[in-house]
Amino acid sequence: MKYELFFFKEGNRYLNLDELFSFFNYCPFITVDTTKDEVEARYSNKAIGLEASFHITRVSKVPDIHRLDPKYLDLDIYLSIDPMMPMYNVGVIVDLVSDLCQKFDFFVYNILFENVAPFRKELILKSYEKIWELYKLKFPMEYTSLNYIAKDKVNDIFKYLYERKDLEAYCHDQNLFFPVPRFIKSLGTGEVYSVVDLLNDKYFVFPPKCD
């Protein structure tokens, strides 16, 4: 089960594929692979554990497409992401979707939308959270095996991880150490803590929300 977001255009299906591939290739976290059935633009950011895929297929993958407003035409392109990602990671991908929609005049659709809609970040995030809840109900054992960290805490930590390399580059002449947080779990309480390893011979930047 994945969260899927489908892309449409209004009134026509024209799309310059060279420009689309250039858009994907410009992103340093994306690699493009082609098979006989589809083109996959795979987004992978190891720093925050973010994996996502844009698929360009030969046939439509939109469920119940017949019930949608016919003025919107399916482009056979969709985004697929894990249904239980941290919301910070979801926001990173949705920001990329925003750029995609703005550049190519795309509209978006998810099975929880009433119809195809213009890009609205809050609409996509809300539908993702609903899919997350449905996934939790459908696969309770998988959910209970997860470790819980408060949303504001994990968002701040992931934001730091996402920006860490840029921070290092900006401060390269100051000999600052930017540690990578690790998560440890108390065997007694089950609570998860964020900790870092420090170097004795360097000044360091203390990451946000570390315990």
Where are these regions (language model features)?
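Short, extreme N-terminal segment that most often corresponds to the first beta-strand
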Residues: 1-49, 147-162
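A structural detector for beta-sheet-dominated domains
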Residues: 8-10, 44, 57, 82, ...
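Structural alpha-beta junctions
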Residues: 26-32, 98-109
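Short, solvent-exposed beta-alpha or beta-beta edge segments that form flexible loop/patches at the rim
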Residues: 38-73
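Generic recognition of long tandem-repeat/solenoid scaffolds
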Residues: 39-43, 73-81, 203-205
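Elongated alpha-helical scaffolds
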Residues: 73-81, 85-102
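Short proline/glycine- and acidic-rich turn/helix-capping motifs at secondary-structure junctions
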Residues: 111-122
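Aromatic/basic-lined ligand-recognition segments
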Residues: 123-211
